[in-house]
């Protein structure tokens, strides 16, 4: 599970075994693809030859027509035989295909027919596949014709000789620029090796030549699936419109339906695929995977048996089940399934790579490294994912490990001295609080890895940099997250992220890894808000505005909304509101019962009925009423007014309008800004006061309290500025600059009361734990309260941050140790201070006390 940054874009679906962020993909190639799709709506082009007509019939799924058209062609020609065999293979008639291919392959061992035979033998797990494919690949070095080069490329790719395949495809593409079949085959290999931008370019080149080339449409859909699922689905559906018998497209759409938690739809698509090809290995694998995650053990084994009856070494049937288990947070089971796959295909680099990723998510990093290194040894071609993972693990090996009970932290050595003081205590607080609330003690050890570089965090989770909107992830017993240094201070709440992910530890384990995403994410955001209300306010205003626009989600669509970049921010927030509604309606007992019901392996409809005797339709009514009670006044404060229209009004007109619309937040804010611009600060202040009364939880520098604080500063009204900054940081947790400004103002007005300054400094280090001044102040306040152990923690953090006055920092720490009776430690710190500043009087006095044994 992930915690997103609600201040920025969101990461699509998690846990994704295939989710990779490629900014260039979306920015540079997706838009032109729409043009290709529009062209694809054009009528079918007339074929210029019988062979082209037969090829067109195959691409569009008219397989019987392929047989008819082939009869008009040279029955001995390898290309004709290969096309006829492909039509048979598409319908699962493997024996028939083999019978027509083998004689021609024997006669022409480097022909298209030989290639199809080799690929068929490989799919069926036949021992002779390698020899057949090597014969097809052999002419690659001397081939000059595009078709010959492409044929060798396909054979080389099937053999796992990707560098040679790359050279063959490159030469074929140059020999026949834009050839749809060549560009598509080239794109498929690029996609397999995670080069999505180049893969999409190849698919687009194919579609520019032939907009109805269905394999290129499906390749495009696969390329887009992680970044833009709705568009990917639209592209795949277009391919299926052209070729209604396209099994690969049906299987792809089924996988997308699974991601959206539409399992019935997925099964229907897979059953349709099996009508076309009853022996489709991919369809059986996905049905088996669905049976597995639905705990239908007998059905799972039956589907596995069907696949293995076709291809006895088809380890993919277990690998796919493992992938889907991982997407459903069942990472230990994913490891077992990947290992079952390896019993059938021990040297499959893809399965080994999957095993490595699954092991990473269980916390077995040595095992993960071994699996990934073995995968890379078997297939060293341009796989940046595996290389990234190994590089990331090299980085992790340099981290400091901190063990505290069932918690194991891995922290960058540059940050460990500071972070371990806060993160360990916060994690214990979170787990203790939530374990009591949910009456559940999670199984440990719980590994928490905190990365100072966001890209290392992203690679740890999905193998590639990116995940721009994600802040943390949880895999049941493993938590990964950005450290406060991974992003500018004030851009995210690292403490909230840690709390959020530890809530996932509870819900994932408590449900036996079967909790749906809407519930586990909803609980995590809900628990953030329970811990500190200010953590959860960043979406309040946007949600109220969405209510006015009718853009909120139906509860039944909530889980699916997590798969779309457009709706995922709303999905997180609305899921938390639903959890709040569940607690208000059924109590914490009801929420606990719902989580435990999922552990029985039932779906959401059954879980709601069993645990709470309700369903989404009944919940929707009460939920809507609850939302209106909570957000109704704020929603009404935003109703109707257009910010641009208000900004364009002349000031007299705006004053008149605002007088008539006293309950309009946008109008009051527009008036305040206009009055401030026209040098009427007192009037502006009154407008902002009215705005603040309408929406007291507004955040950001343009919020009413932030604006009033600035006006007060301009007027040199420190008392009012302090009041406004206090109100501002109460609602806006992220603004570290405002908190620092507030401490400065308090000190300027002579305030030295720890009760007033302490909470502000606490806020500063909650946002930026690397602020030495705040730690120093908190340490000295703790000494005043006679809490030397708390003071020592703060002073240790100061020393770790490399203060300018190291002598004073050592002396501070020495005094805290002295006060707590740790005289040896106090003496070490005192000597350290004197080594820096031999005449430092405070250190000299303390050393004298220590030497003489005075209290």
What is the predicted role of each segment?
Residues 75, 108-109, 141-143, 177, ...:
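Short coil turns that delineate tetratricopeptide repeat
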Residues 56, 201, 234, 241, ...:
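Juxtacatalytic substrate-recognition/specificity segment
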Residues 91-99, 124-132, 159-171, 192-205, ...:
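Structural signature of tandem alpha-helical TPR/SEL1-like repeats
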Residues 47, 78-79, 111-112, 144-147, ...:
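Helix-start (N-cap) detector for alpha-helical repeat units in TPR-like alpha-solenoids
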Residues 83, 116, 151, 185, ...:
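Canonical tetratricopeptide repeat
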């Amino acid at each position: 599970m992930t915690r997103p940054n609600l201040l920025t874009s969101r990461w699509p679906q998690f846990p994704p075994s295939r989710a990779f962020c490629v900014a260039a993909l979306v920015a540079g190639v997706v838009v032109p693809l729409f043009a290709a799709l529009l062209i694809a709506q054009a009528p079918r082009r007339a074929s210029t030859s019988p062979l082209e007509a037969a090829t067109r019939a195959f691409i569009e799924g008219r397989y019987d027509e392929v047989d008819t058209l082939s009869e008009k062609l040279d029955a001995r020609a390898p290309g004709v035989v290969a096309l006829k065999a492909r039509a048979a293979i598409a319908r699962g008639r493997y024996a028939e295909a083999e019978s027509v291919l083998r004689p021609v392959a024997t006669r022409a061992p480097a022909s298209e027919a030989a290639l199809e035979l080799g690929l068929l033998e490989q799919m069926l797990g036949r021992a002779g596949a390698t020899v057949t494919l090597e014969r097809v690949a052999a002419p690659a070095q001397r081939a000059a014709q595009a078709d010959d080069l492409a044929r060798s490329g396909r054979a080389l790719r099937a053999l796992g000789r990707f560098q040679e395949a790359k050279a063959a495809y490159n030469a074929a593409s140059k020999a026949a620029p834009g050839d749809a079949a060549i560009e598509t085959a080239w794109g498929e290999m690029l996609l397999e090796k995670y080069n999505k931008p180049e893969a999409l370019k190849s698919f687009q080149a194919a579609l520019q030549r032939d907009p109805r080339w269905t394999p290129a449409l499906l390749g495009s859909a696969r390329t887009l699936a992680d970044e833009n699922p709705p568009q990917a689905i639209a592209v795949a559906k277009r391919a299926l419109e052209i070729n209604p018998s396209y099994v690969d497209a049906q299987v792809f759409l089924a996988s997308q339906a699974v991601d959206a938690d539409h399992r019935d739809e997925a099964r229907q698509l897979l059953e349709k695929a099996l009508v076309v090809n009853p022996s489709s290995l991919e369809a059986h694998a996905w049905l088996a995977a669905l049976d597995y995650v639905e705990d239908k053990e007998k059905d799972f084994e039956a589907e596995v048996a069907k696949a293995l009856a076709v291809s006895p070494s088809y380890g993919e049937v277990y690998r796919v089940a493992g992938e889907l288990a991982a997407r459903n947070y069942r990472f230990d089971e994913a490891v077992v399934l990947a290992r079952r796959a390896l019993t059938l295909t021990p040297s499959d680099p893809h399965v080994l790579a999957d095993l490595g990723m699954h092991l990473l998510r269980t916390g077995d990093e040595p095992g993960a490294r071994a699996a990934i290194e073995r995968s890379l040894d078997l297939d060293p071609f341009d796989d940046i994912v595996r290389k990234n993972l190994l590089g990331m693990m090299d980085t992790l090996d340099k981290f400091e490990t901190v063990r505290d009970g069932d918690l194991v932290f891995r922290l960058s050595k540059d940050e460990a001295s500071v972070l371990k003081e806060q993160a360990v205590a916060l994690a214990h607080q979170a787990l203790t609080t939530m374990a009591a609330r949910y009456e559940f003690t999670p199984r440990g050890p719980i590994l928490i890895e905190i990365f100072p570089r966001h890209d290392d965090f992203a690679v740890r989770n999905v193998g590639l940099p990116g995940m721009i909107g994600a802040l943390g992830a949880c895999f049941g017993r493993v938590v990964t997250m950005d450290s406060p240094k991974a992003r500018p201070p004030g851009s995210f709440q690292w403490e909230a992220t840690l709390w959020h992910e530890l809530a996932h530890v509870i819900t994932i384990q408590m449900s036996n890894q079967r909790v749906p995403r809407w519930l586990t994410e909803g609980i995590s955001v809900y628990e953030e808000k329970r811990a500190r209300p200010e953590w959860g306010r960043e979406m309040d205003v946007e949600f109220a505005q969405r209510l006015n626009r009718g853009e909120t989600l139906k509860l039944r669509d909530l889980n699916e909304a997590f798969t779309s970049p457009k709706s995922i921010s709303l999905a997180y927030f609305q899921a938390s509101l639903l959890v709040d509604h569940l607690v208000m309606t059924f109590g914490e007992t009801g929420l606990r019962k719902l989580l435990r019901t999922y552990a029985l392996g039932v779906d959401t409809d059954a879980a709601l009925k069993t645990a709470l005797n309700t369903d989404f339709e009944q919940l929707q009514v009460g939920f809507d009423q609850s939302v209106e009670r909570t957000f109704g006044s704020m929603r009404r404060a935003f109703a109707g007014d257009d910010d641009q229209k208000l900004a364009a009004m002349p000031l007299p007109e705006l004053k008149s309008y605002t007088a008539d619309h006293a309950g309009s937040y946008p109008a009051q804010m527009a008036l305040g800004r206009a009055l401030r611009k026209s040098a009427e600060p007192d009037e502006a202040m009154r407008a902002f006061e009215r705005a603040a009364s309408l929406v007291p939880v507004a955040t950001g520098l343009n919020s009413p309290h932030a604006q009033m604080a600035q006006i007060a500063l301009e007027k040199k009204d420190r008392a009012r500025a302090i009041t406004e900054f206090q109100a501002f940081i109460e609602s806006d947790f992220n603004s570290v600059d405002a908190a620092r400004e507030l401490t400065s103002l308090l000190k300027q007005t002579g305030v030295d009361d720890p009760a007033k300054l302490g909470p502000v400094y606490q806020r500063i280090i909650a946002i930026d734990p690397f602020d030495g001044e705040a730690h120093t102040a908190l340490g000295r306040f703790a000494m005043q309260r006679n809490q030397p152990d708390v003071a020592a923690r703060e002073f240790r953090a100061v020393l770790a941050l490399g203060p300018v006055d190291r002598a004073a920092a050592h002396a501070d720490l020495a005094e805290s140790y002295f006060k707590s009776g740790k005289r040896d430690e106090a003496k070490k710190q005192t000597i350290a201070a004197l080594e820096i500043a031999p005449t430092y009087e405070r250190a000299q006095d303390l050393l004298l006390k220590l030497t003489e044994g005075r209290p």
